[in-house]
Amino acid sequence: MLDQTLEPLRAVIARHGLSADKRLGQNFLLDSQLLDRIARVPGDLTQKTVYEVGPGPGGLTRALLKAGAKVTAVERDRRCLPALAELSAHFPDQLQVISGDAMEIDEAAVLGEHVHIVANLPYNVGTALLIRWLTAKTWQPWWSSLTLMFQKEVAERITAKVGTPHYGRLSVLAQWRSEAKLSFPVHRSAFVPPPKVMSAVVHLTPKDQPEGLSLGTLEKITAAAFNQRRKMLRQSLKNIEHMMEALELAGIDATRRPETVSVAEFIAIGRHWEKLSA
């Protein structure tokens, strides 16, 4: 249960003179009901380790603490650290705040295993962080689930089904290594200040064992294919040696366009290409 003596979040923001910094991709989320809803997406967090990136003044952090989680939050905006320190003082056994850049932290070493990542990600680094987590060198990864706020367009790319307009490289990567679903949209009016675009919460859980294929191979093929997404595969992949043979062995018609190729089919193409290139 959240400490009833906590100062209201808006009052904390006003007292510390905080405002969202566009340079850091910040948009503060203050709606407590919405924050509680986000915290419920991963399931029961009681005594679970949760990693939060970019907590800002601590709105989502409060919801996670209320849910019983043990939270490690990393924040690069030093203006927010005093407000987070006050929150940590209320929850000394539940909240650890790290001042730093999430892209530079050795998360597995700091956090251990079986970590739930829950974050309203800064828009300017959200996709880079997702790719970092999806391409963990060891699998199973150190994280157990990802519950992340993105711009709605990015969320749709992550969860897009084959044959739909948003299906692309990010869809293939995310769905190769995880089960990804769009949990719910979030209206721009929920943020302070309101961003220009709508947002959405995405939930990802790692697959037990992604089908055997090197990350480099998948990235090479999908980059070439989707960089020319309106072209047939025989055009977009023609400069990769042995690729036409790999398509034939995988039973893929070279006149198809990349948005019609499923994740499983990209994996099959990659496997045959690796054998031919060995």
From Swiss-Prot:
SMART domains: rADc. It catalyses: adenosine(1518)/adenosine(1519) in 16S rRNA + 4 S-adenosyl-L-methionine = N(6)-dimethyladenosine(1518)/N(6)-dimethyladenosine(1519) in 16S rRNA + 4 S-adenosyl-L-homocysteine + 4 H(+). S-adenosyl-L-methionine binds at N27, L29, G54, E75, D101, N120. It is an enzyme of class 2 (transferase). Its main location: cytoplasm. GO terms for cellular component: cytosol. InterPro entries: KsgA/Erm, rRNA_Ade_diMease-like_C, rRNA_Ade_Mease_Trfase_CS, rRNA_Ade_methylase_Trfase_N, rRNA_adenine_dimethylase, SAM-dependent_MTases_sf. Pfam families: RrnaAD (PF00398). This is Ribosomal RNA small subunit methyltransferase A. It comes from Zymomonas mobilis subsp. mobilis (strain ATCC 31821 / ZM4 / CP4). The gene is rsmA.
